[in-house]
């Protein structure tokens, strides 16, 4: 097995728990429409799917529906106002990042989230990744491997020397297509359409961030 020279992370549900702020934005919309807010535990599984997932969870509206565009824009406007109010790193992530630094292993973020939101959260949480590839960095979103390959190019490393951590089937699909080591995490959001992590054909499933260390 090739030694990992870089660890790349999905963002929402893998590196950071962004669900509280995402849920707050969509519940603000529900109140505006005269509806009761939904409990965060009902919305959490859809957080990794961003606006598309949360608008559908809160209003039953899909991207092909005529009202979707307006709802999506309202959601993004509300989210932009409080993008990192309650967002935090998952427990153990800060310790893992420090361990990677001590081993001279580089790390980065590859996410379908837009650059403006990702950079704002990184600034608030004082994160300084070695590379960043967002949903608007390449023409394709995960599960297409383009953003993962872009990150490897930024690091000037072969994809095979990188592992990619994620909490969704699309993350593992993208990692395999990019030629990276696919590593699933058990602490994320796990969209109901993705099935259980054990069905994703990941190299391993981590119960805690520090469980990655023996696999480096």
Predicted segments with their positions:
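Conserved SAM-binding loop
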Residues: 15, 89, 107-110, 140, ...
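Residue-level detector of anion-binding/catalytic polar loops
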Residues: 36, 106, 181
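Asp-based, Mg2+/Mn2+-dependent phosphohydrolase catalytic module
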Residues: 1-5, 41, 101, 115-216
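Small/polar loops that bind or transfer phosphate-bearing groups
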Residues: 17-18, 47, 109-110, 166, ...
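Anionic-ligand binding patches
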Residues: 98
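N-terminal helical cap/lid subdomain that shapes the substrate entry/recognition surface
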Residues: 2-95, 103, 114-116, 128
């Amino acid at each position: 097995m090739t030694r990992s020279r870089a660890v790349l992370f999905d963002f929402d549900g893998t590196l950071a728990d962004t669900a509280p702020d995402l849920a707050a934005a969509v519940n603000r919309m529900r109140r505006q429409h005269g509806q009761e807010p939904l409990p965060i535990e009902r919305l959490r599984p859809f957080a990794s799917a961003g606006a598309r997932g949360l608008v559908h969870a809160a209003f039953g509206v899909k991207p092909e529906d005529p009202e979707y565009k307006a709802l999506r824009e309202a959601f993004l406007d509300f989210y932009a106002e409080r993008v990192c109010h309650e967002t935090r790193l998952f427990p153990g992530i800060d310790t893992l990042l420090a361990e990677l630094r001590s081993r001279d292993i580089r790390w980065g973020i590859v996410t379908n989230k837009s650059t403006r939101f990702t950079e704002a959260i990184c600034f608030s949480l004082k994160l300084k990744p070695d590379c960043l590839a967002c949903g608007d960095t390449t023409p394709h979103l995960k599960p297409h491997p383009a953003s993962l390959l872009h990150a490897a190019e930024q690091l000037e490393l072969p994809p095979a020397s990188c592992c990619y951590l994620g909490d969704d089937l699309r993350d593992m699909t993208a990692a395999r297509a990019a030629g990276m080591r696919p590593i699933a995490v058990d602490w994320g959001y796990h969209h109901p359409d993705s099935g259980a992590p054990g069905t994703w054909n990941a190299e391993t499933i981590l119960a805690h961030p520090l469980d990655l260390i023996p696999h480096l």
